[in-house]
UniProtKB/Swiss-Prot annotation:
A GO term from the CC aspect: periplasmic space
Alphabetic keyword roster: Antibiotic resistance, Hydrolase, Metal-binding, Periplasm, Signal, Zinc
Name of protein: Metallo-beta-lactamase type 2
Gene name per UniProt: blaB6
Organism field: Elizabethkingia meningoseptica (Chryseobacterium meningosepticum)
Family: Belongs to the metallo-beta-lactamase superfamily. Class-B beta-lactamase family.
Highest classification ranks of the organism: Bacteria, Pseudomonadati, Bacteroidota, Flavobacteriia, Flavobacteriales
Length: 248
């Protein structure tokens, strides 16, 4: 009951969200805070349709996009929608790890003239896989200032992948968790083919210690409005480890 009450309060907090992009059923854009927007795109993985979430920030210099739409068929529709809504172009793109639902748009955004970024670790993985890479790379942690907006990229440790990072917007107290943070309605850890499950718990604790005053967490997939996602991720890791022990 306590968790249900918490979810009801959180749901009420999201009732004022503005939704855009409904003309394309595979792209949904929702205003979260001031100039910060959550965008959700849909794609199919192993026969099941999933939602992928990320954010973009509108600054006085242009638009900063974290990650990318999931599937290149959505790239142009996405940037067209941004320009239609805000009258600004994408000037920066940052990938939070090497998978296509995060780094898949690096080449597209680069061709638009945006500065593209990833960590050196992500860049190394993309190079080995012969995939398009960011123009600029950085070590695991980096602070950015774009016009009137500041944000921070933080590497908490291994989890969903070796290279997963999160992005923190301090003014809005919004954490973009990417795929290291599971949605509150996730039934399991999802794709773990490149995961480090035994390191994942500590990495989540590192996030909690680094950003103790988070107001909103945007999970990488499915329902991002359920703000129990951090604790739920820890629960899912524990459940997985217990099942592994029981099967050995």
């Amino acid at each position: 009951m306590k968790r249900l009450k918490g979810l009801l309060v959180l749901a009420l907090g999201f009732t004022g969200l503005q939704v855009f992009g409904q003309q394309n059923p595979d792209i949904k854009i929702e205003k979260l805070k001031d100039n910060l927007y959550v965008y959700t795109t849909y794609n199919t993985f192993k026969g099941t349709k999933y939602a992928a979430n990320a954010v973009y920030m509108v600054t006085d210099k242009g638009v900063v996009v974290i990650d990318s739409p999931w599937g290149e068929d959505k790239f142009k529709s996405f940037t067209d929608e941004i320009y239609k809504k805000h009258g600004k172009k994408v000037i920066m793109n940052i990938a939070t790890h090497s998978h296509d639902d995060r780094a898949g748009g690096l080449e597209y955004f680069g061709k638009l003239g945006a500065k593209t970024y990833s960590t050196k670790m992500t860049d190394s993985i993309l190079a080995k896989e012969n995939k398009p890479r960011a123009k600029y790379t950085f070590d695991n942690n980096k602070s950015f200032k774009v016009g009137n907006t500041e944000f921070q990229v933080y590497y908490p440790g291994k989890g969903h992948t070796a290279d997963n990072v999160v992005v923190w917007f301090p003014k809005d107290k919004v954490l973009v968790g990417g795929c290291i943070v599971k949605s509150g309605d996730s039934k399991d850890l999802g794709f773990i083919g490149e995961a480090y499950v035994n390191d994942w718990t500590q990495s989540i604790h590192n996030i909690q210690q680094k950003f103790p005053d988070v107001q909103y967490v945007v999970a990488g997939h499915d329902d991002w409005k359920d703000q129990t996602s951090i604790q739920h991720t820890l629960d899912l890791i524990s459940e997985y480890q217990q099942k592994q022990k029981a099967s050995n």
